[in-house]
From Swiss-Prot:
One MF term in the entry's GO annotations: phosphoglucosamine mutase activity
Binding site for Mg(2+): S105, D252, D254, D256
Annotated catalytic residues: S105 (phosphoserine intermediate)
The keyword Cell membrane is annotated on this UniProt entry: no
Origin superkingdom: Bacteria
GO biological process assignments: carbohydrate metabolic process; peptidoglycan biosynthetic process; UDP-N-acetylglucosamine biosynthetic process
GO cellular component, one term: cytosol
Necessary cofactors: Mg(2+)
Biological function: Catalyzes the conversion of glucosamine-6-phosphate to glucosamine-1-phosphate.
Protein name: Phosphoglucosamine mutase
Leader sequence segment: none
Gene3D superfamilies in the record: Alpha-D-Glucose-1,6-Bisphosphate, subunit A, domain 3 (3.40.120.10), Alpha-D-phosphohexomutase, C-terminal domain (3.30.310.50)
Residues with PTM Phosphoserine: S105
Amino acid sequence: MPRMFGTDGVRGLANRDLTAQLALDLGDAAVRVLGDDERSEFESRRRALVGRDTRVSGDFLAAALSAGMSAGGFDVIDAGIIPTPGVAYLTSVLNVEMGAVISASHNPMPDNGIKFFARGGFKLPDTKEDEIEAVLGQDWDRPTGAGVGRVSHDTATATNLYIDHLVSAIAPVGPDKSQPTPLKGLKIVADCANGATSVVAPEALRRAGADVTVINASPDGYNINKNAGSTHPEQLQAMVKASGAVMGVAFDGDADRCLAVDEDGNMVNGDQIMGILARAKKNAGKLNHDTLVVTVMSNLGLKLALRSMGIKTVQTNVGDRYVLEEMLRGDYSLGGEQSGHVINREFATTGDGTLTALTLCNEVVKSGKSLKELAADFPQLPQTLINVPNVDKMAAKTNAKVQAAVEREEKLLGDTGRVLLRPSGTEPLVRVMAEAETQQQADEVCDRLAKVVADELTL
């Protein structure tokens, strides 16, 4: 049977795949697996924290998840609507034993998901998720009487703690308790995707001094990600040009990612954002080992540009959890994905879109350059991606003819391009990607390779 937990928790159609009963059972199982014995003498009660995005199904799922946790003896802090990285931060700063987020990120509104954070605010490794799945729905000696947990609701306190943390990343409060405003006069547009950062991002940017025009920050339970945010940036691009803003930032539904738009409405992707921030950290002496952690999907153009700046790259599989694992293993300080997940370990344990927006805006101000100028230092090689369906995806790395074709194309491209075959994690298809000096060459290489994959691996 396939694992219940995917690359980012448990996801599915709310009230069909992800039911109230399943949420209850997940809460019940999580307290058994994630409850630890590291409590200090002052921690008489076990505690968990739950947050969610703006989907209408989040209400009943949060209630069910919290019920499972409290029935297992945990006092639950319901932080209400708050970005995923906010839950990670609060799990750490409040020193609770675990955190949980109810969100399906950039997925359509009818979907939802549940993912957990361990003490310290880190996503769970596969082994812990498997332990939760193994005890799911099992009976056990649950507490009674005073051993049963309570559920408290405190959205305002949780949100304010998180906003304070975000702003302090670029504007630490001075000894006189005054709040610096490093973004003063910076005119920007923020697209909140009608999601979890609809309150947090505008407030954090304004407190840092920015002149912010906010769009898609009126969630109604049904409009999350709908023609908005990082997956649909067209409205943001138009607003930046129409308003005369110097840049724009776009978040997804749970605000763990951020993409940007320059003053001409051109997209600035996660690779370019990482490049800008990596160079800034290196110049400040804060880029550990002069290395940026990226995934296999990061554009070769980023790696070539960074190499010319004396910055190395380490590559992982797709998924911000794998980026973080490598960052922890190698003691690296910055990493992320082309999709806009950026992990800044100085301030966060997971991708944080609002933090990325603040630090990117800060670098624009400090550099004295426009975002367009900064992004131009990290040109992207033309890229073509073809999905080849209905194939034996597991044979992509072992089929002799496919591997011979890969070697031919790699030899043809040399150091000026690359190819990548990536089996889908959920479907019987292989993603064929090619990067080259020209779009025509990328198209031709990708077409040839996709044909070989189809001819050799079709089921």
